[in-house]
Amino acid sequence: MPEPLTERQRQILQFIKDEIRTKGYPPSVREIGEAIGLSSSSTVHGHMTRLEEKGYIRRDPTKPRAIEVLDGSHTQLKRTIAVPVVGRVTAGQPILAQESIEDHFPLPADFVRADESELFFLTVQGDSMIEAGILDGDYVLVHRQQHANNGDIVVALIEDEATVKRFFKEQDHIRLQPENRFMDPIIVPDCQILGKVVGLVRRMG
């Protein structure tokens, strides 16, 4: 039998479960405090530590929102991660700067093979990649990195605009090739690679 919970601990645990059910990912410490009426983050952390000691949750202190809810027999529920959805990408600004993040999108943790802190979603604009199956309005899952191999589909920054194209490094230039036979490639001396496309999410209807 797991140790009994105090009323405050029960409230916190229930809020975590509710957030995972409705959003697909756990709440932050700040969100827990606001929901339960605790202004001190250290107090919230203290309750979370007790929940962990009693076997109700498991946390990864190196990752934000990394809370796994356990049942009384320590059986782990399926964990999700919250991947940030980035809006406008601007030169000179970190991709995952707080002001760039528009939302978070939940993914099953076992779907992700890369370091989750290096992942972000970007909304595709236009039909330059339709022959690669990437459509206007899709969300591409991007692994943040500054290098690419020939043939990789990348997010590159050109004149302060992020573009999704297939990357080719040629003799004295970079060719960013659209996957649309009616569009011409972008030829530039060099470009900033923001990341490699590793997945895709599409809303139907």
From Swiss-Prot:
Coiled coil (UniProt feature): none
UniProtKB keywords: Autocatalytic cleavage, DNA damage, DNA repair, DNA replication, DNA-binding, Hydrolase, Repressor, SOS response, Transcription, Transcription regulation
DNA-binding region, residue intervals: 29-49
Keyword presence, Iron: no
Keyword DNA damage: yes
Signal peptide: none
Source taxon at top rank: Bacteria
Gene Ontology terms describing biological process: DNA repair; DNA replication; negative regulation of DNA-templated transcription; proteolysis; SOS response
Catalytic activity: Hydrolysis of Ala-|-Gly bond in repressor LexA
Positions of the record's site feature: Cleavage: A91, G92
Gene3D superfamilies, A to Z: Umud Fragment, subunit A, Winged helix-like DNA-binding domain superfamily/Winged helix DNA-binding domain
EC number(s) stated in the UniProt entry for this protein: 3.4.21.88
MF (Gene Ontology): DNA binding; serine-type endopeptidase activity
Enzyme class: hydrolase
Subunit (UniProt): Homodimer.
Cited function: Represses a number of genes involved in the response to DNA damage (SOS response), including recA and lexA. In the presence of single-stranded DNA, RecA interacts with LexA causing an autocatalytic cleavage which disrupts the DNA-binding part of LexA, leading to derepression of the SOS regulon and eventually DNA repair.
Family (UniProt): Belongs to the peptidase S24 family.
Protein name, per record: LexA repressor
Source organism of the structure: Symbiobacterium thermophilum (strain DSM 24528 / JCM 14929 / IAM 14863 / T)
Gene that produces this protein: lexA
